[in-house]
Amino acid sequence: MTKRAEAKYKIDRRMGQNIWGRSKSPVNRREYGPGQHGQRRKGKLSDFGTQLKAKQKLKGYYGNISEKQFRKYYAEAIRMKGDSGDNLIGLLERRLDAVVYRAKFVPTVFASRQFINHGHIKVNGRRVNIASYQVRVGDVIEVKEASRQLTLVLEASQLAERDVPEYYDVDHGKMSAKVTRIPLPNEVPYPVIMEPNLVIEFYSR
């Protein structure tokens, strides 16, 4: 197991929020961070601290993306036309692992990454095993026919704790999803408030 995969159990506690809306989140059981000093009262964050936390939360939500890769998303977001914060969310939501997770083909974004790496996903009829692959509007994502009866897939499609966003056209009978448009941040079903503009400010210092 990679360090990033192991860290998923600590992300909620470090942020002090249930960022995926999971019923088994450790935040539901205690309100302090991980480690022996987790119960210390935290002081007011500086502007830098607030920006850093916003970055860590967004990066963690999408599977604890590496700093190098996340910085590349920032660089691309500021090069694009329009609001850089909106652009950043659009890029993250077009990651293949995010799409597979949003379509409810798997229960978590971490499971999505592993599912893709193991070759269970096709994009426009071709197998893609790169979790960071950028999906485009109109692309059709599907679970390979041989993988559609996996318990992981069948259980995920029935999850009641989250709904499929309106910017996807999903058919769980065929285990396929089509990206209909790029969402704005306020359309993305985050269980907690995300602040992409603070992330842009962090990297723009």
UniProtKB/Swiss-Prot annotation:
The keyword Repressor does not apply. It comes from the Bacteria. InterPro entries: Ribosomal_uS4 (IPR022801), Ribosomal_uS4_bac-type (IPR005709), Ribosomal_uS4_CS (IPR018079), Ribosomal_uS4_N (IPR001912), S4_RNA-bd (IPR002942), S4_RNA-bd_sf (IPR036986). GO terms for cellular component: small ribosomal subunit. It holds the Pfam family S4. Residues 20-46 are annotated as: Disordered. GO terms for molecular function: rRNA binding; structural constituent of ribosome. The keyword Transcription does not apply. Residues 94-157 form the S4 RNA-binding domain. PANTHER family: 30S 40S RIBOSOMAL PROTEIN (PTHR11831), SMALL RIBOSOMAL SUBUNIT PROTEIN US4M (PTHR11831:SF4). HAMAP family: Ribosomal_uS4_B. Belongs to the universal ribosomal protein uS4 family. One of the primary rRNA binding proteins, it binds directly to 16S rRNA where it nucleates assembly of the body of the 30S subunit. With S5 and S12 plays an important role in translational accuracy. Part of the 30S ribosomal subunit. Contacts protein S5. The interaction surface between S4 and S5 is involved in control of translational fidelity. This is Small ribosomal subunit protein uS4. The gene is rpsD.
